[in-house]
Curated annotation (Swiss-Prot):
Keywords: Ribonucleoprotein, Ribosomal protein. This is Small ribosomal subunit protein bS21. GO terms for molecular function: structural constituent of ribosome. PANTHER family: MITOCHONDRIAL 28S RIBOSOMAL PROTEIN S21, SMALL RIBOSOMAL SUBUNIT PROTEIN BS21.
């Protein structure tokens, strides 16, 4: 079972802005928004592989550039 982020407020220290900020941080940390954007449209497996390969190439080139500068 997946635990979803949630923020509980007491009547004593009810500060909506702080609670909202805390909730947004938990949602971002859980990766819910990025997962939702990823699943918003169907992506063919071939397109996913192509994107993954391009990202790996980009990381490799970045690593090479970083090594050349140092």
């Amino acid at each position: 079972m997946i635990s979803l982020p949630g923020v509980y407020l007491n009547e004593d220290d009810y500060n909506f802005d702080i609670a909202l900020r805390r909730f947004k941080k938990q949602v971002e940390k859980a990766g819910i928004l990025s997962e939702m954007k990823k699943r918003q449209h169907y992506e063919k497996p071939s397109v996913m592989r192509k994107k993954k390969k391009a990202a790996a190439r980009k990381r490799l080139l970045k690593k090479i550039r970083k090594m050349n500068m140092a």
